[in-house]
Amino acid sequence: MKSALFVDFDNVYSGLRRLDQGTADQFARMPSAWMNWLLESLELPAPARPGARRRILVRRCYLNPQAYQRFRPSFNLAGFEIVDCPPMTSEGKTSTDIHMVLDMVDLLQQETHYDEFMVFSADADFTPVLRKLRRWDRRTTVLAIGFSSAAYRASADLLIDQDDFVRKALTFGET
């Protein structure tokens, strides 16, 4: 299964930080661990062919460089493209959502057929793009840390359980 992963870093990190600072830092400093869990242990969204495996061909991390510059090297070493999304307003609002949506829609037009779009964000603003992806017969997998709307969750083919992600993915490969 050809997959593309889009990480709304600010959203995931702040959601994890509300749970536990150490957990948030583990997510930010060890993306290779949870990437391996995604590749080796996370189920595929239905319907998947028997024996199919996930290949994450696109790895993009969208982050506010003013707040989270210190985590760039970890994501770079894990093979991510890093898209800087600095604050655009005096309240600190970034353009992460629109960058992610435009990139997802752009991938629909590419020669490579991506079977799965993985969205790491609890932001319900992604609900319309999840529905568009469904209309284009693409599978969607969502990780939402903290509260997410019922409509957003219902628009995903596969929801990664927040507790499973924290318990299994963030410690994947540790002995």
Regions found by a protein language model. Name each.
Residues 151-175:
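C-terminal helix of von Willebrand factor
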Residues 1-99, 109, 134, 139, ...:
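Domain-level signal for Mg2+-assisted phosphodiester chemistry and nucleotide/NA-binding surfaces
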Residues 109-118, 167-175:
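Short, basic, helix/turn surface patches
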Residues 70, 103, 128-129, 151:
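Phosphate- and divalent-cation-binding pockets in alpha/beta enzyme and binding domains
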Residues 48-53, 105-110, 129-131, 164-169:
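A general structural signal for short secondary-structure boundary/capping elements
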Residues 55-57, 113, 155:
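Short loop/turn motifs at secondary-structure junctions
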Residues 95-98, 110-150, 157:
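Active-site histidine-anchored catalytic micro-motif
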Residues 8, 61, 104, 119, ...:
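A residue-level signal for conserved active-site and pocket-lining positions in enzyme catalytic cores
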